[in-house]
From Swiss-Prot:
Record text on subunit structure and interactions: Interacts with HHATL/GUP1 which negatively regulates HHAT-mediated palmitoylation of the SHH N-terminus. Interacts with BOC and CDON. Interacts with HHIP. Interacts with DISP1 via its cholesterol anchor. Interacts with SCUBE2.
EC class of the enzyme, as a word: hydrolase
Disulfide bonds: none
Pfam families: HH_signal (PF01085), Hint (PF01079)
Gene Ontology biological-process annotations: animal organ development; cell development; cell fate specification; cell-cell signaling; central nervous system development; intein-mediated protein splicing; neuron differentiation; pattern specification process
Cited CDD domains: Hint
SUPFAM superfamilies (alphabetical): Hedgehog/DD-peptidase (SSF55166), Hedgehog/intein (Hint) domain (SSF51294)
UniProt-annotated site: Involved in auto-cleavage, residues: 268
Organism: Cynops pyrrhogaster
Sequence motif Cardin-Weintraub, location on chain: 35-41
Protein name according to UniProt: Sonic hedgehog protein
One GO term describing the cellular component: plasma membrane
Length: 432
């Protein structure tokens, strides 16, 4: 008990110090990682284009239809009215139905309203259709669940609708469709969806390489294990496994599968992977540092990775990293969710280099934020070396769920960081 009190005091002091460190400093692997991301130029959606490029009611988008909600149904309490003064609701039925929606839909719509006013001063977001209680849409429409809205701009300038669709996607809607020249259709996942909040994890069956030369499932890691990772210069090293920032043994989650010609890695939408832009014809090895310096690898959410991007994999000899082109990205359900943290902040998982961090797209920021935890665990190991040098089962503090330190960082991050730096599927819902 005394040791845990000491650890928490050290972490608190260290965290305050970490807040004073300039966030722009880079400590990611290689020169290209950890640099501040340039402003992203937004491209309007074309007419009839939808994003992501999968059907609306699939896991990769808004998910399956769960049944119509009526005013008399038990699920009616899932809907909440939206009285945002920056949004115009057409409400042609004069019932207020268009204002009713799920909380997730409301959050994304409110975020979009801000983006619209920033993009076009004097223009507001306009909702033409929200929750439908009258049966005006096709069968199994997500409008019947309050999970979909049809939108325009208040000036009804159709030349803006392509950019409006892009802004909706950036605001976090799970599926956006330039459905009609008269409106944009947007929808979200169900509140209880397995993919609604994914956190940042790997499945329990994902493997890591230990210093002893064996590979084990990530779920079997113990404090004291040294796992294959990469240091700040891009060299492969064996790094101390510290703990799991999230650990759920039986939960089923949706994972993005990033597949190259030889390797495949599974990770949740909000987890960070080191990615380079498409570079045709270069799927060979080479010096890791020169790769970063010339090709611009950076941390990226798994949900943003596309075919043609490049990732870093362990070469055949197991001595270094090579770049490999992503051939396919798809979704897969798997059991277990584990977020291991190493001393270096990186981990080679299924022979692909990944960050240990998630939710915030800047690896270097996350690594600095976790510095107090690394220092605190180091001090604790000095007083109790047996806790961190044996292969005994994890201590009671390593129970299931999200680690308290990670929860604190997430809450602080939502207060001090801009919304577009935090993944909309960031913190996993707590296990029940």
């Amino acid at each position: 008990m005394d040791e845990m009190i000491l650890l928490r005091r050290v972490l608190l002091a260290g965290f305050i110090c970490a807040l004073l460190v300039p966030s722009g400093l880079s400590c990611g692997p290689g020169r290209g990682i950890g640099t501040r991301k340039r402003f992203k130029k937004l491209t309007p959606l074309a007419y009839k284009q939808f994003t992501p490029n999968v059907p609306e009611k699939t896991l990769g988008a808004s998910g399956r239809y769960e049944g119509k909600i009526t005013r008399n149904s038990e699920r009616f309490k899932e809907l909440t009215p939206n009285y945002n003064p920056d949004i115009i609701f057409k409400d042609e039925e004069n019932t207020g139905a268009d204002r009713l929606m799920t909380q997730r839909c409301k959050d994304k719509l409110n975020a979009l309203a801000i983006s619209v006013m920033n993009q076009w001063p004097g223009v507001k977001l306009r909702v033409t259709e929200g929750w439908d209680e009258d049966g005006h849409h096709f069968e199994e429409s997500l409008h019947y669940e309050g999970r979909a809205v049809d939108i325009t701009t208040s000036d009804r300038d159709r030349s803006k609708y392509g950019m409006l669709a892009r802004l909706a996607a950036e605001a976090g809607f799970d599926w956006v469709y330039f459905e009609s020249k008269a409106h944009i259709h947007c929808s979200v996942k169900a509140e209880n969806s397995v993919a609604a909040k994914s956190g940042g994890c790997f499945p329990g069956s994902a493997t890591v390489a230990l210093e002893q030369g064996v590979r084990i499932p990530v779920k079997d890691l113990r404090p004291g294990d040294r796992v294959l990772a990469a240091d700040g210069l891009g060299k492969l090293v064996y790094s101390d496994f510290l703990l799991f920032m999230d650990k759920e043994e039986t939960v089923r989650k949706v994972f993005y599968v990033i597949e190259t010609s030889r390797e495949r890695v599974r990770l949740t939408a909000a987890h960070l992977l080191f990615v380079g832009q498409a570079h045709p014809g270069n799927d060979s090895g080479g010096d890791f540092r020169s790769v970063f310096g010339s090709a611009g690898f950076r941390s990226m959410f798994a949900s943003s990775v596309r075919a043609g991007h490049r990732v870093l994999t362990v070469d055949r000899e197991g001595r270094g990293l090579r770049e490999a082109t992503v051939e396919r990205v798809y979704l897969e359900e798997a059991t277990g969710a584990y977020a291991p943290v190493t001393a270096h902040g990186t981990v080679v998982i299924d022979r692909v280099l990944a960050s240990c961090y998630a939710v915030i797209e800047e690896h270097s920021w996350a690594h600095w934020a976790f510095a107090p935890l690394r220092v605190g665990l180091g001090i604790l190991s000095f007083f109790s070396p047996q806790d961190y040098s044996s292969h005994s089962p994890p201590a009671p503090s390593q129970s299931e769920g999200v680690h308290w330190y990670s929860e604190i960082l997430y809450r602080i991050g939502t207060w001090v960081l801009q919304e577009d730096t935090i993944h909309p599927l960031g913190m996993a819902a707590k296990s029940s």
